[in-house]
């Protein structure tokens, strides 16, 4: 019986060695034909955690779960007209430039306002802009920029405005069934691998349409077919909510609107989270406003009555004064922002100072102990 078991083990080992050798040979051949890294074990990848770039909004970074837009992925931002889609995308452009990256904007709608973009923090002198004549041209330009590996962010505004060449050359009234959907499907197949390889973030802004004859369920849909929905790692639904009234001399005027951004699809974190941001007309997302609200909810900024305090010092009476204080003191703004991100687990806590202080404390304790021992020895000698 023992001999039979031993024989079986030998056969199994021999068979296993043969399979391993066959796999090694196959991997060598694949590497020879297609280059190093064509096939690898998942654990061998240097970067296992998804890299992200901040969206430019703290509330949206928290809703996204990972701390921002994932690099090397496709993002779709859609919603009704004038809901703030382009504003959200321009904040991402400003953040990419702030991080030292290069951003490109494919303006298929031919409606980008340079003055508004600059007000949101975009360096318009460094922004690459293209206003293509057709959908194919716009997607080809986006593809070449992505393939270069030198661009960190590409924004396409919008998918609905990417008109196929055949439709432009034809007459108004001609039927072009599924033409745009086929164009987008082909583009997604070509771009997705390049986007992932170059770690470029591709943001596609999209409009809303309504399906005809829908009696039950949601009649809303987005143009361009289903390909973009499938290839997107993140999809954001942007909707304007209530108007924001001004204060003081502007108390009778609407100075902005509260906007809800819902993460309807997320492949890198749990989906269906919502972010509520204040979009101020002419200024964009109020970063100080969202920080005051979130930090107050977490207790990082203390609120007593109408007064807001941080680290025991009052920073303003009323939210507007607190916002103004943070806008005038960027160092304190960054400090509070860092603490909020640490508390939500978006970034790792920097324990360098804590480790250093604990080390100094330990050194002091050792010095005190040595001093006590020396005093004891001195007393014994005197005795």
Curated annotation (Swiss-Prot):
UniProt biased composition (Basic and acidic residues): 353-369
Region (Disordered): 347-369
Protein residues bound to ATP: 79-86
GO MF terms held by the record: ATP binding; ATP hydrolysis activity; ATP-dependent DNA damage sensor activity; damaged DNA binding; single-stranded DNA binding
CDD domains from the UniProt entry: RecA
Gene Ontology annotations of biological process type: DNA recombination; DNA repair; SOS response
A Pfam family hit: RecA
Subcellular location field: Cytoplasm
Xref: InterPro entries: AAA+_ATPase (IPR003593), DNA_recomb/repair_RecA (IPR013765), DNA_recomb/repair_RecA_CS (IPR020584), P-loop_NTPase (IPR027417), RecA-like_C (IPR049261), RecA-like_N (IPR049428), RecA_ATP-bd (IPR020588), RecA_C_sf (IPR023400)
Keyword tRNA-binding: no
GO CC, alphabetical: cytosol
Keyword annotations from UniProtKB, A to Z: ATP-binding, Cytoplasm, DNA damage, DNA recombination, DNA repair, DNA-binding, Nucleotide-binding, SOS response
Similarity remark: Belongs to the RecA family.
Biological function: Can catalyze the hydrolysis of ATP in the presence of single-stranded DNA, the ATP-dependent uptake of single-stranded DNA by duplex DNA, and the ATP-dependent hybridization of homologous single-stranded DNAs. It interacts with LexA causing its activation and leading to its autocatalytic cleavage.
Protein name: Protein RecA
Taxonomic lineage: Bacteria, Bacillati, Bacillota, Bacilli, Lactobacillales
Gene coding for it: recA
